[in-house]
């Protein structure tokens, strides 16, 4: 498999967990975009947000979408990576974009206590729910395949693999 598989979706939808299972299933590499950005920027995501701002972070995401896609494999994107049209276009050029559609309440339960997510700490459940709804339309518009995120990681990965192999 030479083309990249970009997994997108809201924070806590299962991109990281499903991504690892999917990479094993496809016999390819797995990479996490946030970890890639932290390594290339030599600082944590919360540090980037506080020291350099969200716009700088979004620029780093654009570079990551382009650079990571050259290597193929399964890439778990940050929750906001597909917000920029350019990122979605680059991802579609380099591979296939898959949206893991997980209900907000499930995402919230997974992320509500995560100190490494600056956007969670700065918002209420309700305001993040509004953000979820706004982003859902973008994820849907930019993905080649949408998978139900309520199954087990292996079930979700199997559905994605079936789509990829078509």
What are these model-predicted stretches?
Residues 24-33:
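Post-Walker A helix-loop "phosphate-sensing" segment adjacent to the P-loop in P-loop NTPases
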Residues 21, 25, 96, 134-166:
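NTP-dependent small-molecule kinase module
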Residues 13:
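ATP-binding Walker
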Residues 33-81, 85-92, 117, 125, ...:
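ATP-dependent small-molecule kinase phosphotransfer cores
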Residues 93-137:
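A glycine- and Lys/Arg-enriched "phosphate-lid" helix/loop adjacent to the NTP-binding pocket
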Residues 16:
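Walker A/P-loop
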Residues 7:
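Hydrophobic anchor at the beta1->P-loop junction of P-loop NTPases
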Residues 10:
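P-loop (Walker A) phosphate-binding loop of NTP-binding proteins
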